[in-house]
Amino acid sequence: MKVLAAIALSATAFTGAVAAVLTQEAFLNNPRIHHDQEKYLIELAPYRTRWVTEEEKWALKLDGVNFIDITEEHNTGFYPTLHSASYVKYPPKMQYAEEVAALSKNLSKENMKANLERFTSFHTRYYKSQTGIQSATWLYDQVQRVVSESGAAEYGATVERFSHPWGQFSIIARIPGRTNKTVVLGAHQDSINLFLPSILAAPGADDDGSGTVTILEALRGLLQSDAIANGNASNTVEFHWYSAEEGGMLGSQAIFSSYKRDRREIKAMLQQDMTGYIQGALNAGVEEAIGIMVDYVDQGLTQFLRDVVTAYCSVGYLETKCGYACSDHTSASKYGYPAAMATEAEMENTNKKIHTTDDQIKYLSFDHMLEHAKLTLGFAFELAFAPF
């Protein structure tokens, strides 16, 4: 055990004295320390922690500082590294080009636009707000409808509300295969206005409404495959819409923590956070491309992701870095699962209007979102049949 090295910025003298002698585990398990004083333990880099108030959380995000809130989800010892080696072997080349090409023709920009227009009509999707619960309920109904209309429910497909204490629930659509080896596609459903989260509007069109409707459309396209819908794929496929990413990956941590306890076999996780904004790249004279994260990700899965983009998308990819704890793939990595992440562009050219009232649909490209939907579909289909 390591003695906790850092104490909260405004911690009391009592807390400081306690922290000096307690191990990290004991400190984390002491509810009086962080609950009575409304402090949250955040991690800004592997093993670099700090106690902060909620207001300090938002101030850090305004400054562009990433973190993961580990107040409830304690140190598990599973931390991602820059050059992590895969323990899972992924296909060296695409095996189902004909099937994926046929399914991709059914993907619809119009569906994504209609869904995003409705999704951004909620005043905010802040995870502690009533409208955040309402938006999650609407999204749950859409996922349920997609699964029901495909007929997959007759073969065991389910849509689950994964409850959290803050109100807004996460959503898990599970399409069973012949084994419990599982491939996860994720996006976060919550939005936030960092200036006054509980009051100001947060349409969150790009962050991460775009990712939310992208993977929803990919789910609809994937379920057009009888083999997938009828449960004949080799592996199980899940689509996740996480609550409370903006609070520090709270929803995804809860899910992957439960998966670790249940000894779930998660063979791959792909997060897509912001899939619609390309004007920043175009203004910079950079070609439209999908941004692929190369830091704090599984290197083998990331190589497979590159191969998927090359095979199934009409645009290329550019490698980029977002630092530690930039989205929900961090939670999968934390619990020892191989994870990758894709976004709309290189990080320096991504949308700068996020977390404000101006994160609106009018700035987004549904053509680009369609490329992300193709990516999602190809990734899911190929790994659904991969011989893990």
Swiss-Prot record:
SUPFAM superfamilies xref list: Zn-dependent exopeptidases (SSF53187)
Propeptide cleavage-removed residue intervals: 20-88
GO molecular function, one term: metal ion binding
Positions of disulphide bridges: C322-C326
CDD domains according to UniProt: M28_AAP
Positions contributing to Zn(2+) 2 binding: D207, E246, H355
Catalytic class of the enzyme: hydrolase
Database matches in Gene3D superfamilies: Zn peptidases
Superkingdom of the source species: Eukaryota
Binding site for Zn(2+) 1: H188, D207, D273
GO cellular component, one term: extracellular region
Compartmental location: Secreted
Reported function: Extracellular aminopeptidase that allows assimilation of proteinaceous substrates.
Family per record: Belongs to the peptidase M28 family. M28E subfamily.
Subunit details: Monomer.
PANTHER family: AMINOPEPTIDASE YDR415C-RELATED, METALLOPEPTIDASE M28 FAMILY MEMBER
Stated name of the protein: Leucine aminopeptidase 1
Organism: Neosartorya fischeri (strain ATCC 1020 / DSM 3700 / CBS 544.65 / FGSC A1164 / JCM 1740 / NRRL 181 / WB 181)
Origin organism lineage: Eukaryota, Fungi, Dikarya, Ascomycota, Pezizomycotina
Originating gene: lap1
